[in-house]
């Protein structure tokens, strides 16, 4: 099918946080941690459609467990509904603190299908699953998943995920190549 059938990303929605907002949040984060005796230096900032991850490098002698136990205090200091702490960030010597964006942006499948990640994919059956925390399109190979379980709370995006998988199949193969029966018991 032509890509015109899919909606374009709203440009205003992609600008959910500007650099000044990031700097202000980063300063609040460092200040909040220092109030609890945790000295850190700010690292990279990864902006995704729904959350922004702030990488912080703890000073020598700071225990990671101490940062993990401050999640509610960090959320309070940043005026966020909640924060998630990834300690340590795999492959890096830092702690990631994920903060919800004030205005989450929608992830459109057209953005993923038009991306280099999709067009350059070596997957036998590529599926567009969304975007990573960093905002990078997430494309994976359905053939590498012998079993697939989609679960989550109400409103978490299970149906959207299934729709993305079906649309990925339709945009990757011709009608002669794709044959499936879908049953929705609802």
Feature-to-residue mapping (PLM):
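Conserved glycine(s) of the Walker
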Residues: 157
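Post-Walker A helix-loop "phosphate-sensing" segment adjacent to the P-loop in P-loop NTPases
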Residues: 168-178
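Switch/coupling segment of Walker-type NTPase motor domains
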Residues: 176-186
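The Walker A (P-loop) glycine that initiates the GxxxxGKT/S ATP-binding motif of P-loop NTPases
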Residues: 87, 152, 185
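N-terminal "pre-motor" subdomain/linker immediately upstream of P-loop NTPase catalytic cores
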Residues: 1-149, 161
